[in-house]
Regions:
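Conserved small/polar residues in nucleotide/adenosyl-binding loops
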Residues: 137-138
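Hydrophobic faces of well-ordered beta-strands that scaffold small-molecule active sites
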Residues: 20-22, 48-50, 84-86, 105-107, ...
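Alpha-helix-loop-beta-strand connector modules within alpha/beta enzyme cores
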Residues: 63-85, 124-129
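N-terminal amphipathic alpha-helix/helix-capping segment at the start of soluble metabolic enzymes
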Residues: 1-21
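Glycine-rich, proline-tolerant flexible connector loops at the mouths of alpha/beta enzymes
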Residues: 49-67
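Active-site mouth loops of central-metabolism enzymes
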Residues: 19-33, 61, 85-87
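Short, acidic/polar
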Residues: 30-39, 89-94
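Glycine-enriched alpha-helix->loop->beta-strand junction motifs that scaffold or abut catalytic
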Residues: 44, 98-106, 124-131
Length: 140
């Protein structure tokens, strides 16, 4: 099986390397997200990311702000003109992001370790034209 990779292309974003996608690992408050986005936009960055759902090894830990954070990303897009992105781990995450108009999704390293989760996400994205980078961390 040969893997076909396509470059990520977004209108108004130069195809140069490296492509910088920046923002908080975890979106914790609207103020944090907006402040970070405005600072990055002022530096000329075009791609903003924020973790909305945070998978945890230990149950009971902070699992992210969830769907509420998607409204913050919509506001980032509206106020700065940046493209917005977040990590997805389930089909429900995909559907919520698509409803919110998120521009780019990514599949994190933890999720890639579960082929059932990857297939669920792929099924949710059928017929959708949205960039979906896949993280991969090789652990020794």
């Amino acid at each position: 099986m040969e893997l076909e990779l396509e470059p990520i292309t977004l209108p108004g974003v130069e195809d140069k390397r490296p492509m910088v996608i920046a923002g908080p690992c975890s979106a914790e408050t609207e103020e944090q997200v907006m402040s970070t986005a405005k600072q990055l936009a002022d530096k000329g960055l075009k791609l903003f990311r924020a973790g909305i759902w945070k998978p945890r090894t230990k149950p009971g830990g902070f699992e992210g702000v969830g769907v509420d954070g998607l409204a913050w990303l919509k506001e980032v897009k509206k106020e700065t003109g940046m493209y917005v992105s977040t990590e997805v781990a389930t089909a429900k995450h995909v559907y919520e992001c698509l409803k919110a108009g998120i521009d780019l999704l990514w599949v994190g390293a933890r999720t890639t370790a579960n082929p059932f989760a990857v297939q669920e996400i792929a099924d949710a994205l059928k017929g959708v034209d949205i960039p979906v980078p896949v993280s991969y961390t090789h652990l020794r």
